[in-house]
Amino acid sequence: MKGFLGLALLPLLTAASPVSVESIHNGAAPIISSMNSQEIPDSYIVVFKKHVDTSAAAAHHSWVQDIHSAVNGRMELKKRGLFGFDTDAFLGVKHSFHVAGSLMGYAGHFHEDVIEQVRRHPDVDYIEKDSEVHHFDSPSVEKNAPWGLARISHRDSLSFGTFNKYLYAEDGGEGVDAYVIDTGTNTDHVDFEGRASWGKTIPQGDEDVDGNGHGTHCSGTIAGKKYGVAKKANVYAVKVLRSNGSGTMSDVVKGVEWAAEAHIKKSKAAKDGKAKGFKGSVANMSLGGGSSRTLDLAVNAAVDAGMHFAVAAGNDNADACNYSPAAAEKAVTVGASTLADERAYFSNYGKCTDIFAPGLNILSTWIGSKYAVNTISGTSMASPHIAGLLAYYVSLQPSDDSAFAVEKITPKKLKEALITVATSGALTDIPSDTPNLLAWNGGGSSNYTDIVAQGGY
């Protein structure tokens, strides 16, 4: 596990900038990498400049595949021993992406000779070394009741009389689609009441199943009947991490693209009267790795397309700005709090953290059966509280096809409202550069306007 930021809490690797840029020569595009991530050998994410359209991108793909094939041909001769040594072939383009009509590029496995030519192409903005991504696993386990729902529905610290009471509007989440970009979801679990569906599996050759449990746990906190914040929301599983809880930045970017496109299609269908009752989409990503400009840009592009996005701050007890997607400024970045209203000892912090939500000893749905549950901890558990809360607040608006439809609340406005109505100053052990804000759902009110009018506390 050398260099892998996986399942344990690790210290911040460097106090310097989390991103390094290789030397630029002859006007070539820079190759960037994160100094606190595990790079995948010979794997790259190539991002086009803004002027590149789909036809130019297609021509570029043909060009790079021709170069790749030529290099692989030379390497095949080497494998046959004609030049005296053996080597491995490279796989070429793995994904192409165009996130919400904005961020465009591709990812693949290339020889360094190919990359040297790619970085000199006038259409290329930058190249990022692909790296490992992982879910934020549980730093501690204690079988306990799901106190987190109760906490976000009460202003004051929980007491004996309130610790297990969740105040909520019964229709919370109705008409909202929640995309859980993670390890998958146990869609047959009874707590989803048939509202969970399999969306897309991104890792090549992987199965449409959650073999880990992490994604299912997040989905339950978002939309489960018993364990969820928004109990009527629909869940769509977008699998970007394998059963061991790890994956690649390029697969995560592709997952964000898929979710954004699904949201755009659903929104268009609603405007055309073909998606009755649709109110909007949210997404949750309880995962991360080193700093990735491409992933942060992909998340921001999805938000610009109208998706409400929650991401975990990370479990390194460090500055969230050094990790992606926690550093994506248009998403809601979520730190973890405890039952005692403290910042969880593992939770990341800093100016990139927008809000806190319960993240220690959270009970939710699990894998293994349609009744399975598990208690785990992490900012991974805090973020779906916010994704569920975003879905909850979106659902309080009239649907697009309603006679009472109003101008749709934008992700920017809802993020501002979420912060405005949060309980301020409730938490301890909050660094001075970190917002001391704990999420609040309006205490059971179904009137969004009234909730926002109450402001913070």
Swiss-Prot record:
Protein's job: Serine protease.
Name this polypeptide is given: Subtilisin-like serine protease Pen c 2
UniProt superkingdom: Eukaryota
Intrachain S-S bonds: none
Domain Peptidase S8: 146-457
Similarity comment: family membership: Belongs to the peptidase S8 family.
Propeptide position ranges: 17-136
Keywords: Allergen, Glycoprotein, Hydrolase, Protease, Serine protease, Signal, Zymogen
